[in-house]
């Protein structure tokens, strides 16, 4: 099953995350199929590729709870309807 989840990078105590599409069996920081966004929790900065995210959601990719909350803030799910 495909998951849309966070992949951590950045320095110690200064996390940044890439929002990636990956197989659910792959490690958190393992190889991703596609990068569809970026999230910085320290500055609350978010960059999303809306078209690719909507396409992946329509094909059955499941977002994790944290990613779902980021998508709700950015109103990604409004584009599905």
From Swiss-Prot:
GO biological process: mitochondrial translation
UniProt keyword Mitochondrion, yes or no: no
Gene3D superfamilies: 3.30.1320.10
Location(s) in or outside the cell: Plastid, Chloroplast
GO MF entries: structural constituent of ribosome
Keywords: Chloroplast, Plastid, Ribonucleoprotein, Ribosomal protein
Name listed for the protein in its UniProt record: Small ribosomal subunit protein bS16c
Organism: Emiliania huxleyi
